[in-house]
Amino acid sequence: MQLETQDALYVALELVIAALAVAGNVLVCAAVGASSALQTPTNYFLVSLATADVAVGLFAIPFAITISLGFCTDFHSCLFLACFVLVLTQSSIFSLLAVAVDRYLAIRVPLRYKGLVTGTRARGIIAVLWVLAFGIGLTPFLGWNSKDRATSNCTEPGDGITNKSCCPVKCLFENVVPMSYMVYFNFFGCVLPPLLIMMVIYIKIFMVACKQLQHMELMEHSRTTLQREIHAAKSLAMIVGIFALCWLPVHAINCITLFHPALAKDKPKWVMNVAILLSHANSVVNPIVYAYRNRDFRYSFHRIISRYVLCQTDTKGGSGQAGGQSTFSLSL
């Protein structure tokens, strides 16, 4: 099958995003595994996020490419490809929310934080979030799908009897997953609420940090702390902004498709392609925002790349610069 120019460009960009997502997030997982200083509850959530983003690069993006080309297959195989994409992206969203809640607890109740957020509890929360992601992503298999419409023209040769079980359909996302599910359940129920909650949490974090800083005497140490907290607040605001930038366009298009089908019918194909690329690109920037701006992660990245990529001998001892208290300090 020969690809049109814009389809070929879309596939090429998706493959680049997939490669970057896998490389960056594997590096995050390796850094946590290699450094005892990074093995904290906060970073367990980051590893969950990185794992979801690795899976986006390895599976979700190839599946998205496959269903964008519209090849013919049976309905449930196509539905599985579409739903698996939803499972992984939903897991990534939940992991982002878990990190936000974890950071709020760390700054709101610092003295009780270690007792509240233990490694065992963090792993349990991660397991629950993945189960929820699978439940949400696979909901169309319970009947909320477009099987009747997609297989309405299927008949057995000669007798005219409808046979929907083995009917080949053109495997496009909108042919198997109804927009009502994507808008009402996925967007309004599972994407928009976490986004709004994260915005509120990060605003709260900023307010608590500012309130604490107002009670500090501006000595040299206090000035350094103030600069670090301001930098952290800016980084947290950037997290919310990138999340919205990456995810809202594709859901906005879905809303237009559902509520204004006549308008959506004439939309250029490249518009949806760009929106999908943006949503997948979130898996690339997550390691940059959450990990690359952390001093301990950078040190561990340097060691891993030097030893296993550049094959250089490690001449420095130790496991990093910091301990558990500054696990997610965003200072540079």
UniProtKB/Swiss-Prot annotation:
Protein family (similarity comment): Belongs to the G-protein coupled receptor 1 family.
One GO BP annotation of this record: positive regulation of cAMP/PKA signal transduction
Natural source organism: Rattus norvegicus (Rat)
Membrane topology: Multi-pass membrane protein
Gene: Adora2b
A Pfam family per the record: 7tm_1
Covalent S-S links between cysteines: 78-171
Protein name as catalogued: Adenosine receptor A2b
Extracellular topological domain residue ranges: 1-8, 68-78, 145-178, 260-267
Keywords: Cell membrane, Disulfide bond, G-protein coupled receptor, Glycoprotein, Lipoprotein, Membrane, Palmitate, Receptor, Transducer, Transmembrane, Transmembrane helix
Lipidation (S-palmitoyl cysteine): 311
Source superkingdom: Eukaryota
